[in-house]
Amino acid sequence: AILLPALARAREAARRASCANNLKQLGIIYKMYANESKGEKWPRNHGVQPWRPATAASLGCLNAHNGSQFGPDMVALYPDYLTDSNVLVCPSWNNYDMPPAIGVGVIEDDGSGTCPWVGFISQPGDCYHYLGYAFDRCDEGEPTVPHPYNPAVQVPSQVATTLMLPENATAMAVFLNLSTDPADNAALDQDLVAAAGDGNGGSQTIYRLREGIERFLITDINNPAGSAMAQSQLAVSWDMISSNWENYSTFNHVPGGSNVLYMDGHVEFLRYPHERFPVTRSWAEFWGNMPAQ
């Protein structure tokens, strides 16, 4: 009995390391994609896919899930860059024992031989979040605002205010699964309009992730000697983190914390609560109070 806690910690340490390796592989995949994409852009958000459940079922498809997902665009990545759905599943995830086909929504044929999307991954954002944008002002100490869906909690202004601006309405509709039109995905491939001071480097623009974007991310706009943020400081994907277990899994890892992939490809484990985005109380509140997809 004395050994059980130690064994549990050892198992979790191994799962955490495997989880970090998955994120590192995703970092390589994103870099490979960017090297071949127009403007060296990283993949956009998953968005609205053509396999809406009703349509997919009528064409003989199984496991075609609804929801835009806070993950990368699977049509762009599969199968040329991402070939193994297990890379998207953290071993510490509370649904890890679920078959991968169900857990991340790997589309299968129902036996009719008519499904056109066999093998595609319909819900890539269940374990690791990926937004496709550069958020550089979400650390603790940066400006916060009341959550648009729960004014009782404070969340990062750069994210919350930006998503609620009318100029970003189409992107917001896709993020919140309010759109059923795949044509709206074009909004996710554009930069977002931000309120004054909320944009990257204090501008009015939230840029899509692309190689070289760090040059636009000034660490301190009030300091004439302020330098650009390095890729090693820009978080691009991370373990699930939420303040609300009823809507979403709170953490993949116990004790609470997240593996975080940075744009240069390295991964760090940050224990919650941390002062650095995304393992902050304000970000956990933002995600935990979003409408469940």
Predicted regions located by residue number:
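Contiguous hydrophobic segments
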Residues: 102-103, 144-174, 261-293
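Acidic, glycine-rich loop-and-strand cores that form catalytic or ligand-binding grooves
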Residues: 126, 133-240
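C-terminal accessory segments of extracellular proteins
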Residues: 213-293
